[in-house]
Amino acid sequence: DIIQGTLAKAFGTIGGYIASDDLVCDAIRSTASGFIFTTSLPPLVAESARASIEYLKSNSELRIKQQENVKFLKNELLKHDIEILKNTTHIIPVMIRDAELCNEISKHLLDNYGHYIQPINYPTVKKGEERLRVTPGPFHNKKMMLDLVDSLEKTFRKFNFTKTSINAA
C-alpha cells in the first residue's frame, strides 16, 4: 500500500508525502522524476507541517468550525441558485463553465469587493467545467460569507451570467 497526501491544503505549508514500506519508498526515491528533480523541504517548512499536524490531531474545534462554515455557505449559495458541485470537502466549487468568464469574474470580485476567489480552468479541470474555488475557513464569520454571496450575485448580474443550481449540497 502507498498513502500519499499534501501538506499544502489543511496543513497550510507546501509539499507532500508518501508512506509505504522501505522497498516502495526506495523505488520511488530512485525513479520518480517528481522526486529526483526536486529538493527537500526547508527545515522551517517541515517543522511547520509537523506542528500543524500535531495541532490538528489534538484540537478539533477549528475543523468543526470550518465544517459548520462550509455547510452554512453551501446552503446560502444554493438558496441563491448559485450552482455548486456536490462534494464532501471544504472546497466549494462554484461552476462558471467558461474559462474567460471565470477569470473575469474572479478579477472583478477582487477588484470591486476584495474577495480573492481562485479561478480553476483547463487543464486543471476539463473544458466546460471551469469554476471558482471557494474555501471558507474557521475564522470566517456569517457576515463575511453573506457578503461573498451578495458579491457573487452582483457580479453575476454585471456579467449577465445565468446561474442554475443543479446539485444539493
Language-model features: locations:
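Conserved PLP-dependent catalytic core of the aminotransferase class-I/II
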Residues: 50-112, 116
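Conserved core segment of the aminotransferase class I/II
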Residues: 2-4, 11-60
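PLP-dependent enzyme catalytic core of the Aspartate aminotransferase-like
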Residues: 111-112, 124-169
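Short hydrophobic/aromatic beta-strand micro-patches
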Residues: 19, 93-95, 135-137
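Short, flexible turn/loop "capping" segments at secondary-structure junctions
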Residues: 9-10, 84-86, 126-129
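Cytosolic Rossmann-like ligand/nucleotide-binding regulatory domains
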Residues: 120-121
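Glycine-rich beta-alpha junction loops
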Residues: 9-11, 45, 96-98, 124, ...
